[in-house]
Swiss-Prot record:
This is Phospho-N-acetylmuramoyl-pentapeptide-transferase. CDD domains: GT_MraY (cd06852). It comes from the Bacteria. It catalyses: UDP-N-acetyl-alpha-D-muramoyl-L-alanyl-gamma-D-glutamyl-meso-2,6-diaminopimeloyl-D-alanyl-D-alanine + di-trans,octa-cis-undecaprenyl phosphate = di-trans,octa-cis-undecaprenyl diphospho-N-acetyl-alpha-D-muramoyl-L-alanyl-D-glutamyl-meso-2,6-diaminopimeloyl-D-alanyl-D-alanine + UMP. One of its GO terms (molecular function) is UDP-N-acetylmuramoyl-L-alanyl-D-glutamyl-meso-2,6-diaminopimelyl-D-alanyl-D-alanine:undecaprenyl-phosphate transferase activity. Its cofactor is Mg(2+). The gene is mraY. It is an enzyme of class 2 (transferase). It comes from Fusobacterium nucleatum subsp. nucleatum (strain ATCC 25586 / DSM 15643 / BCRC 10681 / CIP 101130 / JCM 8532 / KCTC 2640 / LMG 13131 / VPI 4355). The lineage of its organism: Bacteria, Fusobacteriati, Fusobacteriota, Fusobacteriia, Fusobacteriales.
């Protein structure tokens, strides 16, 4: 809407600035979540959409029972409303991301809603993967039939995060890469969302870093200087991601310890999906695990725990995901969360540093 006005009114030409719209996107989405947060929490309490706590979890978590969940509805609503207002809606990349966001949100919402109306287990795991796979198919079809960079060799390649060298993997290889990235990221963020504020801050950091990369890849000179693959219109993604960052920070206001609300699968699956989709568009599939190392660590801890128990009958950790392991070691929840935040910040800096190293190694 704002971009449309700038296109048709000469006096508002300045509103086309990516810097200005990114700033506005951050502020608007932050304010929406911040000011709508209290009444939304009150509404969820009235509807009794409260968190269920696993019986075998840390005893300190029993006090969280009944804490409103489905806060992801507020986050995603703020992001979508802000994006519609400030983004260029004729940009095909933005439309692709908006469509993906809505589809991931639908999966998460159905999962959350079923937990209160049908079964505490929510949507079956196989159905989740099936729906996530369908989103991956749409992303793959777009890249294969339309393209991103205008260079098929790049579009159908896996990019080395350090040297920026493209390894051609073809259409079939790209299909499986997209499925792994989308399912992996979406579910990893979901797994991480187990402590107050634990998932949202790493999400904010990763969103900010991807926003910076999106701006670089949409700029001919900067992308060339940093050995990134120029993608027409990707600068708009930095505007979208600023809205994600703002909404995330607004949510943290209520989600930090002790949490007044949880994001639920509506939030975690969708936010993880957004990271995955944009990383694919920007050809940063291998950079994402670096900046999102905490998400990778959490997912790996679950995989290793389940695998070890099935193969050896023994557990590696006191409890998985690994944040519960640290809790059972006697480390306070707030300290575990803060240390994970610090770890994400460190790996985020490493990811940005890796971009600068391109062309040197």
């Amino acid at each position: 809407m704002l971009y449309f006005l700038a296109e048709h009114l000469a006096k508002l030409e300045f509103l086309k600035s990516i810097y200005l719209r990114a700033f506005l996107g951050f502020v608007i989405s932050f304010c929406i979540v911040l000011f709508a947060g209290r009444p939304f929490i009150k509404y969820l309490k009235i509807k009794k959409f409260g968190e269920e706590i696993r019986d075998d979890g840390p005893s300190s978590h029993f006090s969280k029972k009944g804490t409103p969940t489905m806060g992801g509805v507020l986050i995603i609503a703020a992001v979508l409303l802000t994006s519609i207002f400030i983004n260029d809606l004729t940009n095909s990349l933005i439309l692709l991301v908006l469509l993906s966001t809505i589809m991931f949100a639908a999966i998460g919402f159905i999962d959350d809603y079923r937990k209160f109306t049908v079964s505490k287990k929510g949507l079956a795991g196989k159905k989740k993967l099936l729906f996530q796979g369908a989103i991956g198919l749409i992303i793959w079809a777009y890249i294969y039939f339309i393209g991103l960079t205008g260079r098929p060799m790049v579009d159908l390649s896996l990019i080395n995060p350090i040297s920026a060298y493209p390894y051609y993997i073809g259409a079939i290889g790209l299909f499986f890469l997209i499925q792994i990235v989308l399912m992996g990221t979406s579910n990893a963020v979901n797994i991480t969302d187990g402590l107050d504020g634990l998932a949202i801050m790493p999400m904010i950091i990763c969103s900010t870093i991807l926003g910076v990369i999106a701006y670089f890849t949409g700029h001919t000179e900067l992308s060339s200087h940093l050995h990134l693959f120029y993608t027409v219109g990707s600068g708009e993604l930095s505007v979208f991601l600023s809205a994600v960052t703002g909404a995330g920070l607004g949510f943290l206001w209520y989600n930090c310890y002790p949490a007044q609300i949880f994001m639920g699968d509506t939030g975690s699956l969708t936010l993880g999906g957004i990271l995955g989709v944009i990383a694919i568009i920007l050809k940063q599939e291998l950079m994402l695990p670096i900046m999102g190392f905490i998400f990778v660590l959490e997912a790996l801890s679950v995989i290793l725990q389940v695998g070890s128990f099935k193969l050896r009958g023994k557990r590696i950790f006191k409890m998985a995901p690994i944040h519960h392991h640290f809790e059972l070691m006697g480390i306070p929840e707030s300290k575990v969360t803060m240390r994970f935040w610090i770890g994400t910040l460190i790996f985020g800096i490493i990811a940005l540093g890796a971009i600068k190293m391109r062309g040197i190694l």
